[in-house]
Amino acid sequence: MRALRVQELRELGFPALRLVNGPLTLTLIPDLGGKIAVWEDRRRGLSWLWRNPYLPWRLPQAEARYVQEFDLGGWDECFPAIAPGIYPADPWVGTPIPDHGELWSQPWKIQIRIEEGKRLIVTGAAEGRSFPYRFERTLILEADRPAVRIRYRLQNTAEHTFYFLWAAHPLFPLLPGMRLLIPGPATARVAAAIGVAPQAMVFPWPQLPIEGGFLDLREPDPEGKWALKLFLRPAASWARLIHPTGAWWEIGWRGPITHLGLWINAGGWSGANTPPYQNLALEPAIGAPDDLGVAMREWGFFGLLPPLQEMEWSLQVTVG
């Protein structure tokens, strides 16, 4: 029972909540869109999530730009799209969608409870600014288990159908010897490429065709000077990141999730006029690619929620 605890503290100047269940520590920042800033395996002394070494932490203001100013690292939720754009359907057609969505830039309301001394349940919620919805994420930590269940609930509060994209956005440092394990056979589709020229936009994971051969994406070279955004349809609903030490971080999913988004930045890109980053993201997603208009017009993968209805999905993260 003593394994479960919640501690109030400050993380880089922000009020934060430290959630502990024995093997794991998570640090949550409600004022930054419910950001999970720290995901630590206490048994190994290993903190998994990437943190931007260049950008200062501060509260987002109106019209804040994510990649230029707030690509801070950790785990954010991207909704109702990932790329900035214009909402493509009535009655909100023409309404701007901010970069990486609306959720990261607003404070979340947090509720905490402990059930029977065995289960720590932390629910964060936010409502749409430009669109009529309620978004809810619940973290469930059981005592002495190296796993976190994450439940999502989305409510459409309008009398019109709501179209959307969603992606979890946990960022990890890309280290020499870090490996990706994605169950195959899996088909990958290129959504963006920087510093590398794919010879095919759809290919069997993990061999990306390039001029003169293939780029094996299972163990990306952090010094490759390229970046890729891919969307995959794995053979099973999970993916694993393996640390050079042999430790691993695995994410699984259930519900209407259509793709695994994969961002690999091998020192090829920064949107903030800083040196390029070395990071990657494993992103279970509803819909693809990152732009809602493109998803609806071209790719045909997007979320759809009828008037006054709700939907649920879930993730589970396990570390070893």
Name these PLM-found stretches:
Residues 1-149, 160-163, 170-320:
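Surface-exposed acidic/polar loop and edge beta-strand patches at domain peripheries
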Residues 152-158:
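Asparagine-centered strand-capping/turn motif at beta-strand->loop junctions
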